[in-house]
Amino acid sequence: MNKEAAIMSGLKWLNSFEAARNMAISTKKLVLIFFHSPSCNGCKKTLEKTFTDQDVADLLEGDFACVKYTVTQDENMTACYNVEWTPTFVITDSEGRELERWVGYLPPDEFITQVHLSEGLAEMHAKRFKAAEAAFEWIIDHKPDSEAAPEARYYMGVALYKDTGDARHLERTWETMNKRYPGNNWTKKAAAWS
């Protein structure tokens, strides 16, 4: 077994998008596609440091049907998702429609926060607002000082509004953000709701 195979064995990766699609349909999970390259240092760190973290593995296996592709070997999938840099993480629905993506290595703690943010955005794009709210709320409750927190708070307001149609959620979001994250770009965007 090569080093990559040994590292990747900690996570339960599915062997094809079709397998991920079937799992996503039967479990109502989203699909997470990990694009990597053998020559990419960020990919190596993701494999060796991030994916070996038990909290990362538990989150990914609990919330997603995970599949991985090597960009130099799986050129059709790489082209289909317009992967220009690695590592790239793409969240799709069960039909393969891209809902969200992010690029680049993150250590385990920041990776978990990014997963929650991207999962919330993906759920919102899929119009599953309660699931989006839960993902954003995780960041607000567990990582309130993270770089992702203002964006999560902003989109929590959007998800609540889209879920209920109640514009007061937007105004309360602005008020909370203005107190908690003054001067942040996401707070400036929320100022339209004041």
Regions from the language model: what does each represent?
Residues 132, 169-170:
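Single-residue signature of alpha-solenoid repeat helices
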Residues 124, 156-161, 194:
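Specific register positions within alpha-helical solenoid repeats of the TPR/Sel1-like families, i.e.
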Residues 54, 97, 101-107, 139-149, ...:
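Short solvent-exposed coil/turn linkers within tandem alpha-helical repeat scaffolds
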Residues 79, 112-146, 180:
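Alpha-helical segment of the N-proximal tetratricopeptide repeat
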Residues 17-26, 52-118:
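Thioredoxin-like thiol-disulfide oxidoreductase module
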Residues 7-56:
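Local sequence-structure signature of Cys/Sec-based thiol-disulfide redox active-site neighborhoods
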Residues 129, 166-167:
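TPR-repeat structural position
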